[in-house]
């Protein structure tokens, strides 16, 4: 009976919310790939953060770019990619290096990486889809495009994209 309670407590300590338990027993097989991908992400994250923040600020500070619906979607994409470079990539590096060094990854790192990944990459994918659809409308509708695709509607679409991804991630 006492052993059963102890096993239940150990299982509760090792669960990490909605995330499945990773298989750290095979860490030796992934050691080199973890090291390489961790180093690559650590090198490129600052460049990505800088580039995406410059794109976002350029659109935000320029009145002519802010008034173009397609530029607002690009700003939404730049914001999402900026968050990838400051949240997802560093947590990925921490995840892989902890896996290599300790054979275990803290639950907070796993949750930050997984939820940041789901939200940011979901937003990126949906924003790219919205950009494609907006460009299709620009080609297809010609003269009616400016009346149909407005800055206000694009902002609503961008807010809906963020809301949907955050809501769907939090439902897990």
Which sequence ranges carry the predicted segments?
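Alpha-helical transmembrane segments of integral membrane proteins, especially early/N-terminal helices
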Residues: 1-13, 75-87, 162
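Extracellular N-terminal segment of 7TM GPCRs
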Residues: 1-54
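Extracellular TM2-ECL1-early TM3 structural module of rhodopsin-like
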Residues: 30-46, 68-131, 138
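Generic alpha-helical transmembrane segments of integral inner-membrane proteins
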Residues: 46, 50-53, 86, 159, ...
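C-terminal TM-helix exit segments that contain a strictly Trp-centered aromatic cap at the helix terminus
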Residues: 87-91, 167-172
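Class A GPCR helix-loop hinge within the 7TM core
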Residues: 119-159
């Amino acid at each position: 009976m006492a052993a059963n309670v102890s096993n239940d407590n150990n299982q509760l300590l090792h669960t990490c919310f909605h995330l499945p338990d990773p298989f750290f027993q095979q860490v030796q097989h992934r050691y080199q790939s973890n090291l390489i991908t961790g180093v690559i992400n650590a090198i490129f994250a600052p460049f990505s953060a800088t580039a995406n923040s410059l794109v976002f600020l350029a659109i935000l500070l320029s009145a002519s770019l802010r008034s173009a619906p397609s530029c607002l979607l690009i700003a939404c994409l730049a914001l999402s990619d900026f968050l990838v470079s400051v949240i997802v990539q560093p947590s990925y590096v921490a995840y892989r290096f902890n896996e290599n060094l300790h054979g275990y990854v803290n639950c907070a790192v796993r949750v930050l990486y997984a939820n940041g990944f789901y939200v940011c990459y979901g937003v990126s994918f949906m924003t790219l889809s919205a950009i494609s659809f907006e460009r299709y409308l620009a080609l297809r509708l010609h003269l009616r495009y400016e009346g149909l695709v407005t800055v206000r509607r694009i902002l609503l679409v961008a807010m809906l994209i963020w809301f949907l991804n955050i809501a769907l991630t939090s439902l897990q």
